[in-house]
Amino acid sequence: MVGEIPVLLIMKKPIVVSGDVSVYDVAKLMVEQDVPCVLVVCERPNHESIEVATDKDIIKKVLIRKLPPDKVKVEDISSGKLVTIPPNTTIDEALEIMNKYKTNELFIVDDGKIVGVITEEDLIKIAPEIISTLKELVNYLLQIIDEVTSGDISDKSKEIQNINQGKDNKKDSESDIRKKKIMLIK
């Protein structure tokens, strides 16, 4: 049930940076915005491309190699391997795609444009909220079932039918019938 929710409902707007920005500035932005990745617009000879830079890229390609993050451009560590999905993809499908492509982020594309991003972390964070909402829904449905099975609603339904039959017999005015129905609901 939870897994059938489309990613469109939980996606975030991606953060986009220019490829000539330093890794240091991108890392700082990622920490400030609490995101594990950014889209990078790279100006390559003869074409422009959109790539992704992740927190793991910064660690593996800059910090582990002891390169100065303020001197390395983000386009030098970004990857063109964007995994994209349509907005109606379900959470279950998104998780399967993440596992298949061994990625922690998916980019949502609509009409050829990137409109959102969803990360494994987003899916983990959203799970408790979804579970809480589902618990509320289940409790509400159980309450309705209890009312129906206790006869309370069916008794009221019968009373409304009796009131309506009284209307057919012209015993009560329309106003009297409305008043009786309102009193019944209260």
From Swiss-Prot:
Domain CBS span(s) in chain numbering: 10-69, 77-133
Gene3D superfamilies: CBS-domain
Coiled coil ranges: none
Record carries keyword Lyase: no
Family matches, as InterPro entries: CBS_dom, CBS_dom_sf, Diverse_CBS-Domain
SMART domains in alphabetical order: CBS (SM00116)
Keywords linked to the UniProt accession: CBS domain, Repeat
Name the record gives this protein: Uncharacterized protein MJ0450
Organism expressing this protein natively: Methanocaldococcus jannaschii (strain ATCC 43067 / DSM 2661 / JAL-1 / JCM 10045 / NBRC 100440)
